[in-house]
């Protein structure tokens, strides 16, 4: 299922799907959305997921406030030129926000094209 309006809360999810949610995957979202969308993602996910379920993010991240490649740095600049609220997020800041909603970073997986998959687990704090 695709949530198109990322800032709209609560998310409108058909009732027949609510009981079958086992995890949430967000691909290439938080760098092309405002920081409020990231907050909304964690907030709404925390309401929908049970303890032990996962939220996975995929996309580019800075590590320790540093870009992992020159191409990611150039991509970040191009995003900010399109919209000043967009940009490659620092993983530490994202995980800090996740912690506020009872998610803990469980696994970080390096992916092709200087991207990462980050798996958060609910209720692991």
Each language-model region and where it sits:
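Conserved Class I S-adenosyl-L-methionine
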Residues: 68-92
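A short, conserved alpha-helix within the catalytic core of class I
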Residues: 32-48
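Core SAM-dependent methyltransferase catalytic element
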Residues: 101-125
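Conserved small/polar residues in nucleotide/adenosyl-binding loops
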Residues: 1-5
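A conserved beta-strand element that flanks and buttresses the S-adenosyl-L-methionine
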Residues: 25
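Conserved acidic residues
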Residues: 22
């Amino acid at each position: 299922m695709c949530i198109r309006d990322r800032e709209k809360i609560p998310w409108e999810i058909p009732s027949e799907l609510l009981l079958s949610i086992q995890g949430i995957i967000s691909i290439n979202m938080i760098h092309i959305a405002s920081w409020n969308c990231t907050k909304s993602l964690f907030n709404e996910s925390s309401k929908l997921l049970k303890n032990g379920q996962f939220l996975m993010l995929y996309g580019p991240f800075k590590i320790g406030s540093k870009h992992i490649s020159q191409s990611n740095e150039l991509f970040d600049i191009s995003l900010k030129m399109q919209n000043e609220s967009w940009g490659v997020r620092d993983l530490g800041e994202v995980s800090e926000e996740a912690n506020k909603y009872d998610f803990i970073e469980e696994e970080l997986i390096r992916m092709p094209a200087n991207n990462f998959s980050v798996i958060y687990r609910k209720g692991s704090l």
